């Protein structure tokens, strides 16, 4: 299966100096092949305007980016129960809306650890689709972010289109989930579940930001 995103695509959305790549020796020896390609060749966005905030520990010292921390180093590691086997070795990528973003090195699956809930939720099938989602959100930013555009004619349409494109690339994050703007489900109801991470991002797009 062909990759969804490459370095040229990411550089068309983010400044090249804001795309972090890792030396191979700083990555685990046993790392899913597609994830390794993303981390060594494509890069992760390190941009304050991005919905993804990379783990700050990656940039301590002069030889950054550093090796990734693992979930075993989380402050509240002992509070997590009934987690997938081997999760303690997952790499900590960063955060989105206070949810910790992690990478299962064996399968290449991206998980989030929802803030305060001490569980794992599958965020993307692969690091490739995760990074592709960050690309889509950034390339469409002029159509929903008033800090880069004076006029935003249809942020709602942009959000709807983005969600459809994301589903085509990786349906996993959206399975059984109504969008934030759905009239069929009330996300603000007292008994409503927590809105999944990518739908929170798309809710921001829908409402426009800046």
Cite the ranges covered by each PLM segment.
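A surface-exposed partner-binding patch
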Residues: 1-101, 168-210
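Generic detection of long, well-ordered alpha-helical segments
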Residues: 4, 25-29, 120, 124-127, ...
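Polyanion-engaging groove/track-forming segments
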Residues: 55, 89, 120, 153-161
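A contiguous binding-surface segment within folded domains or other stable secondary-structure elements
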Residues: 86-118, 122
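A ubiquitous, low-specificity "background" feature that marks scattered single residues
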Residues: 110, 130-132, 156, 181, ...
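Compact, glycine/acidic-enriched structural inserts
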Residues: 111-150
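An amphipathic alpha-helical core segment
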Residues: 135-179
């Amino acid at each position: 299966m062909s990759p969804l995103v490459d370095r040229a695509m990411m550089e068309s959305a983010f400044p090249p100096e804001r795309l972090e790549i890792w030396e191979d020796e700083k990555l685990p020896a046993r790392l899913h092949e597609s994830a390794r390609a993303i981390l060594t060749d494509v890069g992760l966005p390190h941009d304050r305007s991005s919905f993804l905030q990379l783990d700050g520990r990656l940039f301590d010292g002069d030889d950054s980016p550093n090796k990734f921390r693992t979930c075993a180093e989380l402050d509240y590691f002992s509070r997590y129960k009934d987690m997938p086997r081997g999760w303690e070795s997952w790499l900590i990528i960063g955060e989105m809306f206070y949810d910790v973003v992690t990478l299962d090195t064996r399968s290449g699956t991206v998980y989030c650890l929802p803030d305060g809930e001490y569980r794992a939720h599958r965020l993307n099938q692969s690091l490739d689709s995760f990074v592709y989602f960050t690309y889509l959100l950034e390339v469409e930013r002029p159509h929903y972010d008033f800090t880069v555009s004076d006029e935003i004619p249809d942020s709602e349409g942009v959000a709807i289109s983005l969600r459809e494109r994301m589903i085509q690339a990786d349906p996993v994050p959206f399975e059984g989930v109504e969008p934030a703007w759905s009239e069929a489900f009330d996300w603000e109801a007292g008994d409503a579940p927590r809105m999944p991470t990518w739908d929170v991002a798309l809710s921001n797009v829908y409402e426009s930001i800046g």
